[in-house]
Design a protein with these regions (language model features):
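N-terminal Sec-pathway targeting helices
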Residues: 4-23
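Solvent-exposed, non-transmembrane regions of membrane-associated and secreted proteins
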Residues: 26-263
Length: 263
């Protein structure tokens, strides 16, 4: 009985120590995630309270340019967690910002970034901006909800700004795609090529919000989503209503008007 009692006590002590070890590991993991999350949520005005004007968050551009010269914009969407800087990816390491934050430090949250093919130009005909979909709904997670029209209407416009201008973007369409299929286009030979591409995307889209106003420049916000495909992405295609548009009733008209403009 004494031997059994000692063995039981030893097992209990081991179980207690192991449980304590697991708790410590869990605390370290949670602390690490909290740290990464905090680093991935920089304030637009680090030295002052965050303020908004006409929906746009006020950004201290001088400060952020001194922190990271790759910063080119800031995006926020009212009623969501989307409120982040945007950096420009570089051709020599196009996926760098998938795992690095605005401070250039390793961070699994990354930071939203403009596709390297756009060469830092947010006015590229199809400017593609990527952001992670995190389990805590941070980063671009809320964009995956835009496939629902009611959600789009409740969370529009998308506020996007650069050091030089501010844009209230209207959502044109939302598409849920398999990232393993299809190509990516950011720049086109001419306006006709862009219109042809845009109308093709519109025809295939999961949700069409505006089928009559043909933009001449769009911004696609891209994030992972988890529904139909194994490697699924949600694309939220938006445009500045203040930028040039071609008002048409159907795709063929769009091509005709564009050809007339090019002539």
């Amino acid at each position: 009985m004494n031997k059994g009692s000692k063995a039981d006590k030893l097992h209990s002590r081991f179980a207690f120590i192991f449980a304590g070890f697991l708790v410590c590991v869990a605390v370290v993991i949670v602390a690490g995630l909290v740290y990464f999350d905090n680093q991935a949520r920089p304030s637009a005005t680090p030295n002052a309270p965050e303020t908004y004007e006409d929906g746009f968050v006020e950004v201290d551009w001088d400060y952020w340019k001194s922190v990271n010269p790759d910063i080119i914009g800031w995006v926020n969407v009212e009623g969501t967690q989307i409120n982040y800087p945007i950096v420009a990816a570089h051709a020599e390491d196009p996926n760098y910002y998938l795992k690095h934050d605005i401070y250039g430090k390793y961070n699994p949250y990354g930071v939203p970034y403009l596709d390297a093919d756009c060469e830092g130009n947010i006015d590229a005909q199809n400017a593609v901006i990527y952001g992670h979909h995190m389990n805590n709904d941070s980063m671009f997670s809320d964009f995956s909800n835009f496939k629902d029209l009611a959600y789009v209407e409740e969370h529009s416009p998308i506020y996007l700004q650069t050091p030089d201008k501010k844009m209230k973007l209207d959502v044109k369409y939302v598409d849920v795609i398999n990232a393993n299929q299809g190509g990516k286009y950011t720049n086109f030979d001419d306006l006709t090529s862009f219109v042809t591409w845009y109308q093709d995307q519109l025809d295939k889209a999961t949700l069409v919000v505006d089928k009559y106003a043909q933009p001449t420049h769009v911004i696609n916000f891209c994030t992972c989503s988890y529904g139909t495909f194994r490697n699924e992405r949600t694309l939220v295609c938006a445009a500045d209503p203040a930028s040039p548009h071609i008002l048409v009733a159907n795709p063929e008209q769009a091509k005709e008007v564009t050809n007339d403009q090019a002539a």
